[in-house]
Structures are given as C-alpha cells and as structure tokens.
Amino acid sequence: NRRSHGAGGAGRTEVVESVFGITKADSGKVFLNGKEVTGKRSPRQMMNLNFGLLPEDRQKQGLHLHWSINHNISLPVIDDCTNAVFLSGKKEYELSNKMKELLAIKAPTVDTHSGALSGGNQQKVVVAKQLAANTKIIVLDEPTKGVDVGSKAQIYQLMSDLASQGMGILMISSEMPEVMNMSDRIYVMSEGRITKEFKAEGLTQEE
C-alpha cells in the first residue's frame, strides 16, 4: 500500500486525475505493471487496464445518485451483463447483491437509490463498482472524507482485506493519523511534485 500526503492544493488529486485520463498532463509518462500506457489515458482505457479510481467527490464523479445501487455497480461491466442487445437483469442483480453482501452495504435492497445512502455506504458502492470491474490497482482519493467513525473503520478494514488479496492501493489523504496507520510507504507532495518519501514502519508524526 502506498499513501500520498499533502495539504490541500499540493497537487495530489491533479496528478491522479491526469494519470487516469480525466485531465491532461503537460508532461510525463505513465507506466502500469512495467508497461508504458501514456497514450492510453482515457478513463475507459485505464479501466480496461484494471486501473480504478475512487474520486474525492464521490457524489459528482463516483456515483449516479438518482440511480439504484444495482445500476451503479453494474455500469462498469455492462457488457458482461448483456446478451446481444438485451440486458440480463438476473446477472445485474446477482452481481450487485454479491457486492452488497461482500461490502456490507446498508440498504433495504439493491434497488435503493444511491442518493438515499449515508456517506459511508455511498463510498462502499463506489468501491463495489471497482471490484465488479476486476480492478487490480486502485487510487482512493480521501476515501473517508465525510463518513462517520463506524464507516471509517469498515473502509480501513476493507482496504486491508483488498491489499492482502493482492490489490495495489494508493490512498490520497490529508489526515496524518490515517496516513501513518494505513501505509507501507508514504509520499509527501507539494506543488505537484513528490518532495519526501518515507517507510511508514516506525515513523513518527514529528518526522
């Protein structure tokens, strides 16, 4: 697990968005699993390379709030739920119910509108979309922002579980205790550049 830390305006989100193809970088190269993918940087292309992003603004960038949990989760893999030109509702529901149970999303059913969920459960739906898409590397941009203490603990546990299963995780956070407790390695950014790098083990906040 890697963590990027810096104050607001440090350029962390901008770097990630340029890597994922949301915005265009002025320069630089992107490598994924040792292969250069600089020319393949649209969100759809990066998703096809099993690279996922959980954006900081989940309500605007991560979810369709007026859609159900079911439709949000199945969106990235809609082709897998389609037979010719017909959408398989059965496959959709099987997938979304599996993710609801796996991530302990608190909602009466997967037909519940995502906008009716708590912040923590909305975050879980965004993560579920990435898992459904078979993501291998995921960037979590302020994943616990605006969620309650209980949901934070669940998100931390989920991150640990995913990392133990082999998923690569880069978390962007401005909360120092979160960074130190959830990291293997920490990168500090300022003005769009990495200024320091630390191994998390044995690190103190003063350092």
PLM regions and their residue ranges:
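Glycine-rich phosphate-binding loops of nucleotide-dependent enzymes
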Residues: 1-207
